[in-house]
A protein has these predicted regions:
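Short helix-boundary/capping micro-motifs
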Residues: 11-27
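Residues within the DNA-recognition helix of helix-turn-helix
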Residues: 29, 36
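A short LG(V/I)-centered, amphipathic sequence patch enriched
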Residues: 41-60
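Residue cluster at the C-terminal edge of the helix-turn-helix DNA-binding motif
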Residues: 16, 25, 38-47
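N-terminal winged-helix
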Residues: 30-31, 80, 86-106
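Base-recognition residues in the alpha-helical recognition helix of bacterial helix-turn-helix
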Residues: 8, 35
């Protein structure tokens, strides 16, 4: 099963167009990153990148890029909405002013 971490890693590689540059950005080894991408490719049964310099997306990679971008966006949105349900005051804005100034405004 493809997980969100692998999708995130894929998107960073696609943006960087390099496994080594993406690995540096993610603070992981290039071997670890390659293993995550290989896991996705094995699971879906096709390559996502043309291993040229710079890396380019295959047609399947382009489709996966669109889907992964959308899924990660929806996941982040859902997490924010759920957090707002759990803690509605989390994103509230508080303004502090002195009593004298508040009276003058009212």
């Amino acid at each position: 099963m493809i997980n969100f971490l692998n999708m995130k890693y894929f998107l960073v590689v696609a943006e960087a167009r390099s496994f080594s540059a993406a690995a540096k950005q993610l603070y992981i080894s290039q071997q670890t990153l390659s293993a995550h991408i290989a896991q996705i490719e094995e699971e879906i049964g096709t390559q996502l990148f043309e291993r040229t310099r710079p890396l380019t997306l295959t047609p399947a990679g382009e489709r996966f890029h669109r889907g992964a971008t959308e899924m990660l966006f929806l996941n982040a949105q859902m997490e924010r909405e759920l957090q707002d349900i759990v803690d509605p005051m989390r994103n509230s804005f508080r303004l502090g002013i002195s009593h004298a100034y508040a009276r003058a405004l009212l």
